[in-house]
C-alpha cells in the first residue's frame, strides 16, 4: 500500500515537471563597451518612457545543480532551470526499485557568443535642419524628435523557439557590454536634448539622429532533454544535440547617436 502511494506521488511530481514549456539563457564574459562621445543618454527626456528589461541569470537550487552536473551538455536555459528548481524527487527508501525516463521536451540549451560589435548608426530616426544662409550670425539648434519612432531588432536567421533564443542572446549581450539592451524600444515625439550645435553664418545645418544597436554573433545549442530516475539516483540525459549559427541586432535602450553637418 505504501509502495502504491509512493508511485502515485512520484507520478504527480513528474507530470508537474513535464507540464512546463521552454525558454532561454546565456554564457558570456563581462567586457564593458565604451560609448563614443556622440552617444547620449536621453532616457529622462524620452516622452515615451520605456520599462527596463528585467533579466537576470536564475540561480539553480542545490537539487538543480546536482542534476545539471550529470548532463554531458551544458545547460543555461533559465526556464529549464526554473522548472528543475520548482520540482523535487525525494530519495525515499521506497524508490530503490524505481526506474523511469521522462521526456522533458526539446530545448534551446545554451548560447555561446563569438562576437559582439556596436553599430552606432543602426537606424536613422530624425533630422533637424536650419537654413542660415541668409543669417547675420551663428544659429544654434538642438535635437527635437519630430515623429515617434519604434526601433526593432531581431534574429538574423529563423530558428526554433525564437523567444527562448532571443532571451539567451540578450542575457549574454547585456552581461558582455553592461549596456541597457532590448529588442524593441520607442523614442516619443517631442523628445528633446539641451546640447546645442552651431550653424555658421551663410550655412545649412543638419543634425542627424541615429538609434544605436549591438550586433551579436554566436551559436545556439538544442537538445532533447530526459530526466532519468534509477532508484535514488537522478540525472539529466540530453540526446540528438544540434547546433546552429545565429546572429541578432539588439537596440540600445534610452541612448541616441548624434551627427552634425554644416554645408554652404
What are these regions (language model features)?
Residues 1-31:
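Sec-dependent N-terminal signal peptides of Gram-positive bacterial secreted proteins and lipoproteins
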Residues 1-7, 135-139, 143:
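A short, flexible low-complexity segment enriched in Lys/Arg and Gly/Pro that occurs
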Residues 2-9, 27, 151, 158, ...:
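Short acidic DE-rich linear segments
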Residues 27-48:
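Short N-terminal segments immediately surrounding and downstream of signal-peptide cleavage
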Residues 46-141, 180-264:
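Core pore-forming/fusogenic effector modules of secreted, proteolytically activated toxins
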Residues 138-189:
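Membrane-inserting effector segments that mediate pore formation, membrane fusion
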Amino acid at each position: 500500500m505504501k509502495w502504491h502511494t509512493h508511485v502515485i506521488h512520484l507520478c504527480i511530481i513528474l507530470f508537474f515537471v513535464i507540464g512546463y514549456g521552454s525558454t532561454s539563457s546565456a554564457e558570456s564574459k563581462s567586457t564593458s563597451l565604451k560609448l563614443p562621445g556622440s552617444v547620449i543618454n536621453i532616457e529622462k527626456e524620452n516622452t515615451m518612457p520605456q520599462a527596463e528589461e528585467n533579466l537576470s541569470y536564475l540561480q539553480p537550487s542545490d537539487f538543480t545543480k546536482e542534476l545539471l552536473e550529470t548532463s554531458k551538455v551544458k545547460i543555461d536555459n533559465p526556464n529549464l532551470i526554473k522548472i528543475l528548481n520548482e520540482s523535487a524527487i525525494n530519495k525515499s527508501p521506497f524508490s530503490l526499485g524505481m526506474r523511469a525516463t521522462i521526456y522533458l521536451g526539446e530545448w534551446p540549451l545554451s548560447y555561446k557568443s563569438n562576437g559582439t560589435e556596436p553599430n552606432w548608426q543602426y537606424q536613422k530616426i530624425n533630422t533637424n535642419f536650419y537654413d542660415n544662409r541668409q543669417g547675420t550670425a551663428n544659429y544654434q539648434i538642438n535635437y527635437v524628435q519630430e515623429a515617434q519612432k519604434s526601433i526593432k531588432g531581431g534574429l538574423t536567421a529563423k530558428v526554433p523557439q525564437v523567444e527562448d533564443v532571443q532571451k539567451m542572446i540578450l542575457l549574454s549581450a547585456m552581461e558582455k557590454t553592461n549596456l541597457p539592451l532590448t529588442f524593441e524600444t520607442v523614442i516619443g515625439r517631442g523628445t528633446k536634448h539641451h546640447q546645442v550645435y552651431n550653424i555658421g553664418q551663410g550655412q545649412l545645418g543638419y543634425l542627424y539622429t541615429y538609434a544605436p544597436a549591438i550586433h551579436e554573433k554566436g551559436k545556439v545549442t538544442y537538445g532533447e532533454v530526459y530526466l532519468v530516475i534509477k532508484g535514488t539516483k537522478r540525472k539529466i540525459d540530453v540526446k540528438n544535440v544540434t547546433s546552429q549559427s545565429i546572429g541578432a541586432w539588439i537596440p540600445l535602450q534610452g541612448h541616441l547617436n548624434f551627427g552634425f553637418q554644416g554645408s554652404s
